[in-house]
């Protein structure tokens, strides 16, 4: 389903008091992220992680992995939020619609995720806390037989997860 944790690496739910502390931090960051043009923000993993979806149409031209100028303003604000919240790990996933072959879509989805990754690095976000991956057309969220559905399926999803330090700090605070 739509709210399923896409990244297998999304991690176990911490739960309890420590999970509530992490959830509060994620609530604050989610509120910040909701101000960004073109970003759809939802909390996942019982509120302990954030999923931000950027429609590829906002970021890229068709069949392109070059960020357009309009998307840069959104990603600048996104990078700023990541820098203000350093105790998180960031997973960037590229997705395409089903138009074209896997031979085109799979590398395109990787290049799109990598473009976002490289742009965030250029804005000062540490590459050590980020990873990226492309899924081609294997994880549609809408019907590929309609133009609107294909538009929804062309997207970059970014998961913001508590890193080991945030989890450790929350567990100590919860004691």
Name these PLM-found stretches.
Residues 38, 59-94, 121, 151, ...:
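Periplasmic peptidoglycan-binding/anchoring modules of Gram-negative envelope and division proteins
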Residues 12-13, 28, 32, 70-77, ...:
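Extracytoplasmic/secreted proteins, especially bacterial periplasmic and envelope-associated proteins
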Residues 26-54, 58:
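Amphipathic, membrane-active segments
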Residues 12-16, 53-61:
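Acidic/histidine-rich, surface-exposed loop or edge segments in extracytoplasmic proteins
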Residues 18-20, 59-68, 102-105:
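Second-shell loop/turn segments in exported
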Residues 95-169:
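Periplasmic OmpA-like peptidoglycan-binding domain that tethers envelope proteins to the cell wall
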Residues 50, 88-90, 130, 156:
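Conserved beta-strand core positions
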Residues 1-31:
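Short, low-complexity, glycine-enriched hydrophobic/amphipathic alpha-helices that associate
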